[in-house]
């Protein structure tokens, strides 16, 4: 039976923190564009976050396996609230790049460690349901944030969005500080024992397939988050509120279907779910190229969200199973989160180059190509192991 107290604390703390981030991040491309940033610099703003997070993810993930989850979670959330103040004080594009780099360090302490904590308390056979339910905090926070950010920006100012981010991150920090049990009471697997070697984790074909799929799927998200606001603002002349709605839709729809798809992942072939979801999301990326109205983008964003909502619970269920078997939940989850970070970096920066060299709409084609590659590689790695349940010795 899952520990409902810990689960609820992590759920609401992450929801508050991610909502705060969601308020600010979709407006950063427009904010940077107003400072004179081109496509490459917009890509760097998102890429800087991914670089710092990717470097430190394995370190914090493995260390949390040995030292406990709570210290990393509360420090990371406190740093998020400090970063919001820095955003409010920034005056040029370089400031934004540096701040996002520091924010990536804080994120490396939060996301993989929180998900590993949930994995620690997940009962066997309930991986899909548990991770699907928990992922709702992430996806719904990211979806509500952009809408709130657009409304706050239109009604007040961009500086007000930074204040909201800081307050919500502080709320997440206080919830975890007060309600999570002390580190000594955590069910951390490794207590003075040597952790499983990285080469053993990386050599597992299922983990490799999960990593590459997560990388390519998130590259598509990087393109959307970085350049859909620019497309909607520059070419379609939409308001900040409507831009926020468009960015929100994909993650909102994905969040809604997380729980039913998670339950389904506990009952059927998880490989099939990942492949079907990936193909739907890739098709949506191609359709973004032909955007001509708010209504069209509305429908395509929903389609992308459905694809992610089908794939991600099954993907995370496989990852949690692997983490439990290896007694290295933090290490396995941090590796997948690294794929997420690298995908966001490659997607946003690659799309920025495509925008500067060719055309803004070509950026979405790049995302589609990467996603099709990810689906194919995932199928190759798991073709003989459709519902993996073992870890190499």
Model-derived segments and their meaning:
Residues 83, 94-102, 295-303:
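Paired small-residue
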Residues 109-122, 310-324:
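Intracellular juxtamembrane helix-capping segments at the cytosolic ends
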Residues 36, 68, 89-95, 237, ...:
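Helix-breaking motifs and short loop linkers at transmembrane-helix boundaries and internal kinks
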Residues 99-138:
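Cytoplasmic helix-loop-helix junction between adjacent transmembrane helices
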Residues 167-186, 377-382:
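C-terminal membrane-cytosol helix-exit motif in multi-pass small-molecule transporters
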């Amino acid at each position: 039976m899952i520990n409902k107290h810990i689960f609820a604390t992590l759920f609401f703390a992450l929801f508050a923190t991610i909502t705060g981030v969601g308020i600010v991040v979709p407006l950063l491309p427009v904010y940077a564009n107003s400072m004179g940033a081109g496509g490459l610099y917009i890509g760097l703003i998102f890429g800087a976050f991914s670089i710092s997070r990717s470097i430190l993810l394995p370190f914090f993930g493995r260390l949390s396996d040995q030292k406990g989850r709570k210290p990393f979670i509360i420090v990371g959330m406190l740093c998020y609230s400090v970063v919001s103040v820095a955003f409010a004080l920034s005056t040029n594009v370089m400031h934004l790049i540096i701040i996002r780099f520091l924010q990536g360090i804080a994120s490396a302490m939060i996301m993989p460690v929180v998900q590993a904590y949930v994995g620690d308390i997940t009962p066997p056979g309930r991986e899909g349901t548990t991770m699907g339910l928990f992922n709702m905090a992430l996806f719904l926070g990211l979806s509500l944030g952009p809408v709130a950010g657009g409304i706050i920006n239109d009604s007040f100012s961009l500086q007000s969005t930074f204040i909201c981010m800081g307050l919500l991150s502080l709320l997440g920090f206080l919830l975890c500080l007060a309600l999570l049990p002390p580190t000594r009471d955590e069910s951390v697997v490794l207590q003075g024992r040597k952790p499983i070697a990285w080469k053993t984790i990386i050599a597992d074909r299922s983990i490799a397939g999960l990593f590459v799929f997560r990388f390519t799927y998130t590259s598509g998200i990087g393109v959307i988050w970085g350049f859909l606001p620019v497309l909607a603002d520059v070419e379609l002349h939409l308001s900040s509120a409507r831009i926020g709605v468009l960015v929100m839709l994909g993650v909102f729809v994905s969040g809604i279907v997380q729980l039913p798809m998670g339950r389904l992942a506990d009952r059927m072939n998880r490989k099939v779910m990942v492949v079907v979801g990936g193909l739907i999301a890739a098709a949506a990326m191609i359709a973004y190229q032909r955007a001509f109205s708010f209504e069209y983008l509305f429908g395509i964003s929903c389609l992308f969200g459905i694809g992610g909502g089908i794939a991600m619970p099954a993907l995370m269920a496989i990852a949690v199973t692997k983490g439990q078997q290896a007694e290295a939940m933090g290490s396995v989850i941090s590796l997948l989160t690294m794929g997420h970070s690298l995908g966001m970096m490659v997607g946003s920066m690659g799309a920025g180059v495509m925008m500067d060299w060719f055309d803004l709409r070509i950026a979405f084609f790049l995302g589609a190509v990467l996603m099709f590659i990810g689906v194919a590689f995932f199928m190759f790695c798991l073709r003989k192991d459709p519902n993996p349940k073992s870890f190499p010795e």
